[in-house]
Swiss-Prot record:
Species the sequence originates in: Dictyostelium discoideum
Segments of skewed composition (Low complexity): 94-140, 211-235, 267-278, 366-401, 500-517, 740-762
Compositional bias annotation for Basic and acidic residues: 519-535, 690-702
PROSITE patterns given in the database record: LIM_DOMAIN_1, LIM_DOMAIN_2
Keyword Metal-binding: yes
Region annotation (Disordered) ranges: 56-192, 207-242, 255-294, 364-412, 426-445, 450-622, 632-651, 690-807, 829-848, 857-957
Protein keywords: LIM domain, Metal-binding, Repeat, Zinc
Segments of skewed composition (Gly residues): 172-185
Gene3D superfamilies: Cysteine Rich Protein
Short name of any one Pfam family annotated for the protein: LIM
Record's compositionally biased regions (Polar residues): 83-93, 141-166, 279-294, 426-435, 456-465, 478-499, 863-872
CDD domains xrefs: LIM
Designated name of the protein: LIM domain-containing protein A
LIM zinc-binding domain segment(s): 3-61, 982-1043, 1052-1117, 1118-1179
Length: 1183
């Protein structure tokens, strides 16, 4: 079998090296890197051989190729759960450099001789007391981090450190005074948290007050133990200047309070219970917050050092918190936690996740210049601001720039309120956020809208973070940079207990920087005035006058109860019902819309503080995508003969009030010119209110610049009349009024004609009890589509425009022509199914086109495919009617709950012929049937008479709409390939192009000649199996040979062809030699030897040469004179005869006489070697 060397890709004959599943020549098995011979040891990398030196070298991309650095000793952090149960092993912090105490801005001037002015209380843990009267800046406070400094290198001298630590903090096991000699220096701002009971555990935590002002309290007598009380009580009436001090809060586990623990509920004016007998330092405050039923979190026994003296982290912040706490606070957001206890300088540590999450609060501490002129020095500690303390409310106004939330009586101290981190660089320096602001409040279902969801504000004037963001007043509860719009950073504010004040929800909508706010009535309702939306979702067939509940409410209406609201609602319903009946008798039609869902409100406020300043509005646009679904709305379409000159002025000044809408549809606002625009569908409510105030719709001037168009139907002989001269039909004259309004645009006066908005609501959703509604989408310029009207035959109806501006009645998503601003509003309409069918078959192959002449552009609407019902109806009415010239419109309304409305689309193109519409609409007979009952439908059927057909035939070809240019046809070039005239051996198909011929002269497609094992196309040399004629690629051949190796070893190989024997082969075995039957041949004539007629010449122990007897006796081969065997290899010629090299021997000693060795021929004519001759001659001489 053939083997291929992996390295040189040549055939391996003889000895091979088989490694990694590949064969190698002995000289080809070398190192891949250095090409050295691998005779003894080799190493494998990715099935490639390497020598030992190259194997140990680092290689690119090797994951083990990592530079080994010298390990340095370091302190390994220890988990808090592994800390000692008691303080036998206290932390020995490392010393820090000099800590400057120049931040102490206020000092206490004590006039007593016994006062000890310790401006720099740099106490050392190794000293029991520190009564220093000078500035000892070199003996600096150690810089230690309780979260990372626990290590084996720091746990030394545990007993002495424990004693020194307790004595320096004024904690003694057997009682006594706190800090020694009344100095009260101790370790400032070092806090211990202990579990009261048998298993005590204390964790030292450092409270940071970096770069803040501290009080230098000078204790002058033993009465100082009772003077350092917590200023969270009502005992402190000092009006103090707020100073920024940081404190930290970590979540704590649930621990029940033990007996004897010192408790300060943060509400009662509890005096410090620590005196000279309690072992608590006299300048510290003790806290243990009461558990809350909601959060069930209890503060453990806490000893908090006052802010007196040096802070261990004043000079430099520890590594776990970064370089500076100010940088951390400015980049962090407070995450509200319901189970976090609030108190003054309290750490709550959660045992299951130690040190997982730290909340840093910036407290406003108070610092005073206290002039103590008596022996009893009243040291006023920093007033640690308590957010939940109701009794400290008088100081809250002066101690905080932002008014903190009042959660009611201080009953639940463990409930956390969403409090933002406010940073003030100076005292009483209120933060001024940037101007741009956007507020978006959700009103899905009946959830209360909360200002914490999304609130950006301007010009922070309010001190209450619980107040909502009011765009008009520029109030905000959190600082924001200019033009910042990150809606994901804010989370909903959780409800804080029963005593939490109800959140005032405000939704604002602005178009010209003018806003109105609508407060929320209670938690059960959405925005006030939207109580009817739930009724709309449940009863879609309620009376259309229910939508009048969307009237505008100011902030005073939030206090109305439900009965008042229902009473007013019924009164409005009766009033609107009377007005509707009156208007219906006058021929005015009220079309009703009903859509429902849940939603959101969008508020956009420009950078313009002055609404009259239009220059800033060009800076950039805003693109918002907000889901909307609108509640029930009534759009009153009315006729207005003349435009009011002040309509545009009122449109620019209109104020839109959005009372909160439900999500369910998409609103996309794009404004390339930079003008902020809000698409407010609720503006239609203002139109309704103004419309009902005017009984006569023809004399009504809508403040939203309503465009009204009159369509009167006149005699069929008259063509489509001029807008200024409508014709009335003598037989049946009917006027159909449509009032079209342009909702919500914020347009600059000089750009008002170019920047116009349009809103298309399609399909109409109405119940059988409602009037059918057509809402019209129009932008400058406008176009009108008659396809919305359904016509019945034998009725004369003509359309006349009263204004040059026309309206396009198209049930499409939104169609703007030549409008720089496009606004697309799509609605998911529930509880309704509205189907529109428009068919416009024409007289010829071209569809009937209805065109309206207008001053700017011409828009034509085309409808296709007449139904069978229309054809039958027309045939029944007039036998001579040509079906191609008829037009059928049908509006089908179905109240199918749970189905979405089916949308129909119309085809619009522009024509240049102004007379086409007049010619097309000549002698058309129309009729309007208005049903004011449960179902209102418009059925318009165009009935054509013979005169109309003649006029239609006289229409010139030039008046037809321009045909679209023919599409360019691209053809693919096909190249014909001549057939080879042969078929593929595999697929039996004719071969075109390249042809592959194998060793048997068989033809294949190149893609059909594949390996029988891996089925890959063979382009390289291949191998065959003779028994089955299968084709194998080189790789598969090697694999198959390796798999068959054990079997080949058992059968052996042929000594002639060196191929392995198989079970199917006929084998000839001679001694140890095996041959194929066809391989056992004569070496002279190369014929297969049959039977035993052969002569053998053995070359080695495993190979021999054979010759048939025919060649042997014919003289074609030499015969040995000694053995009479055939000579096929090397022979020796001596004494005229041929000998095998091994057969020419000495006749005396029988030693082989080699080539070129002297010998002698004796008398018997046999060879004698030289040694035998010499021996015989010596013996003869001795005789």
């Amino acid at each position: 079998m053939l083997f291929i060397c992996r390295k040189c890709n040549t055939r391996v004959e003889g000895e091979t090296i088989f490694v990694f599943g590949y064969h190698y020549h002995p000289n080809c098995f070398v190192c891949v890197s250095c090409n050295c011979s691998l005779s003894d040891v080799y190493f494998e990398i990715d099935k490639l051989p390497y020598c030992e030196l190259d194997y140990k070298k680092p290689r690119p991309g090797d994951p083990t190729n990592v530079p080994v650095l010298k390990k340095k000793p370091f302190s390994k952090p220890v988990d808090a759960s592994n800390l000692p149960r008691t303080w036998n092993n206290s932390v020995k912090p490392t010393n820090n450099n000099n800590i400057n105490n120049n931040n102490s801005n206020n000092s206490n001037n004590n006039n007593n001789n016994n006062n000890n002015n310790n401006n720099n209380n740099n106490s050392n843990l190794n000293n029991t007391t520190n009564n220093s009267n000078n500035n000892n800046n070199n003996n600096s406070k150690p810089n230690y981090n309780p979260l990372t400094s626990f290590g084996s290198n720091n746990l030394k001298k545990s007993t002495s450190v424990e004693n020194n630590l307790k004595s320096s903090n004024g904690i003694s096991s057997g009682g006594g005074s706190g800090s020694g000699s009344g100095s009260g220096s101790g370790n400032p701002e070092l806090m211990y948290m202990e579990k009261n009971g048998a298993d005590q555990q204390s964790i030292p935590v450092v409270l940071d007050s970096t770069n803040k002002n501290n009080n230098n309290n000078n204790n002058n007598s033993n009465n100082n133990n009772n003077s350092n009380n917590n200023n969270n009580s009502n005992d402190s009436d000092n009006k103090q200047t707020p100073v920024n001090v940081y404190s930290a809060s970590i979540e704590n586990q649930i621990i029940e309070p033990k007996h004897g623990s010192l408790i300060n509920d943060g509400n009662n004016s509890t005096k410090s219970k620590s005196n000279s007998n309690t072992g608590v330092p006299n300048n510290s405050t003790q806290y243990n917050a009461t558990p809350s039923p909601s959060s069930e979190v209890v503060n453990q026994f806490v000893v908090v050092e006052s802010d007196k003296g040096q802070n261990p982290t004043n000079a430099k912040r520890s590594n776990s918190f970064g370089d500076s706490l100010d940088d951390i606070i400015s980049s962090m957001e407070m995450i509200p936690k319901n189970n976090v206890s609030t108190g003054s300088n309290v750490f709550n540590i959660q045992d299951d996740e130690k040190f997982k999450e730290i909340q840093l609060k910036k407290h406003n501490e108070n610092n005073n210049n206290n002039n103590n002129n008596n022996n009893n020095n009243n040291n006023n500690n920093n007033n640690n601001y308590n957010y939940n303390n109701n009794n400290n409310g008088e100081n809250n106004q002066n101690n905080s720039n932002k008014k903190q939330p009042h959660i009611g009586g201080g009953e639940n101290l463990d409930e956390q309120v969403d409090i933002k981190i406010n940073k003030c660089n100076e005292v009483n320096d209120s933060y001024q956020p940037s101007k741009p602001s956007v507020a978006i409040y959700s009103s899905n279902n009946n959830n209360n809208l909360k200002p914490g969801n999304i609130a950006y504000g301007n010009n922070s004037q309010s001190s209450d973070p619980s107040e909502p963001v009011v765009i008009g007043d520029h109030r905000s509860n959190s600082p924001r940079t200019k033009s910042q719009l990150d809606l994901n950073q804010y989370q909903p504010t959780p409800n804080v207990g029963k005593s939490t004040q109800p959140t005032t929800t405000t939704t604002t909508t602005t178009t010209t920087s003018t806003t109105k706010t609508l407060p929320n009535k209670d938690n059960d309702n959405h925005l006030h005035g939207h109580d009817h939306q739930n009724d709309d979702n449940n009863n879609s067939s309620s009376d259309s006058s229910d939508s009048e509940d969307d009237s505008v409410h100011d902030s005073s209406s939030s206090s109305e109860d439900e009965s008042d609201h229902e009473r007013k609602r019924k009164a409005r319903k009766e009033k609107k019902k009377q007005q509707k009946q009156l208007k219906h008798r006058q021929g005015h039609h009220i079309h009703n819309h009903e859509v429902g869902g849940g939603g959101a409100a969008v508020v956009i406020d420009n950078d313009n503080e002055n609404p009259d300043d239009k220059s800033k509005s060009k800076k950039g646009g805003l693109h918002l995508d907000v889901d909307f679904t609108f509640g029930k709305k009534e759009h009153h379409h009315q006729q207005q003969k003349e435009h009011d000159d002040d309509a545009e002025e009122e449109q620019a000044k209109v104020k839109y009030v959005d009372k909160g809408v439900q999500a369910g549809s998409d609103l996309s606002i794009s404004n390339p010119s930079g003008t902020m625009i809000v698409e407010d569908i609720h503006t239609a409510k203002l139109k309704e209110n103004d419309h009902h105030a005017h009984p006569n719709p023809l004399e009504h001037s809508h403040p939203h610049q309503s465009h009204s168009h009159s369509h009167s139907h006149s005699h069929p002989q008259h063509p489509h009349s001029h807008p200024q001269h409508p014709h009335s039909h003598p037989h049946q004259s009917h006027s159909h009024s449509h009032a079209h309004s342009q909702p919500t645009t914020t347009v600059q006066p000089q750009q008002q004609q170019q920047h116009s908005l349009s809103t298309v609501v399609h399909p109409h959703n109405a119940t059988p009890s409602h009037h059918h509604h057509h809402q019209h989408s129009h932008s400058q310029p406008h176009s009108f589509d008659h396809n919305q009207h359904q016509h019945q035959p034998l009725q004369h109806h003509h359309h006349t425009h009263s204004q040059p501006i026309s309206i396009q009645h198209q049930h499409i998503e939104n169609k703007h022509i030549d409008s720089p601003i496009q606004h697309h509003v799509s609605h998911n309409i529930k509880n309704s199914h509205h189907q529109h069918q428009h068919q416009h078959p024409s007289h010829s192959d071209e569809p009937i086109v209805q065109q309206h002449v207008q001053e700017t552009t011409k828009t034509t609407t085309t409808q296709y495919k007449p139904p069978q019902s229309s054809i039958q109806n027309n045939n029944n009415n007039n036998n001579n009617l040509i079906i191609e010239d008829s037009t059928h419109h049908s509006h089908n309304l179905h109240n199918n709950n749970g189905r979405d409305g089916i949308k129909s689309y119309s085809k619009t193109f522009i024509t240049d012929d102004p007379n086409y519409h007049q010619n097309q609409n000549q002698n058309q007979h129309h009729s309007h049937q208005h049903h004011s009952h449960q179902h209102h439908s418009h059925q318009h059927h165009h009935h054509q008479h013979q005169p109309y057909q003649q006029q239609q035939q006289q229409i010139k070809v030039d008046s037809l709409p321009p045909q679209r240019p023919k599409e360019k046809v691209y053809t693919q070039t096909i190249t014909t390939i001549v057939s080879s005239g042969k078929n593929c051996k595999r697929c039996k198909l004719e071969i075109f192009g390249n042809t592959l011929i194998n060793h048997l002269q068989e033809t294949y497609h190149p893609e059909c000649f594949k390996c029988s094992n891996c089925f890959s196309s063979i382009v390289d040399p291949y191998f065959t199996e003779p028994s089955t004629n299968k084709i194998f690629c080189a790789k598969c051949q090697i694999v198959l040979n390796d798999l068959a190796k054990p079997k080949r070893d058992s059968l052996g190989f042929c000594c002639s062809c060196y191929k392995f024997l198989t079970e199917e082969d006929d084998i000839i075995v001679i001694d140890k030699e095996k041959y194929h039957n066809k391989c056992f041949k004569c070496s002279s004539c190369k014929e297969v030897i049959r039977g035993n007629n052969f002569s053998r010449e053995q070359m080695t122990s495993t190979s021999s040469n054979y010759c048939c007897n025919t060649c042997l006796h014919s003289g074609r081969v030499d015969k040995c004179a000694y053995c009479h065997g055939v000579i096929l290899g090397v022979s020796m010629l001596a004494m005229g005869q041929n000998y095998h090299p091994k057969c020419f021997k000495c006749s005396t000693c029988h030693v082989v006489i080699r080539h070129n060795t002297p010998f002698t021929i004796n008398k018997n004519q046999t060879p004698t070697c030289q040694n035998c001759i010499n021996t015989s001659s010596v013996g003869v001489a001795s005789r």
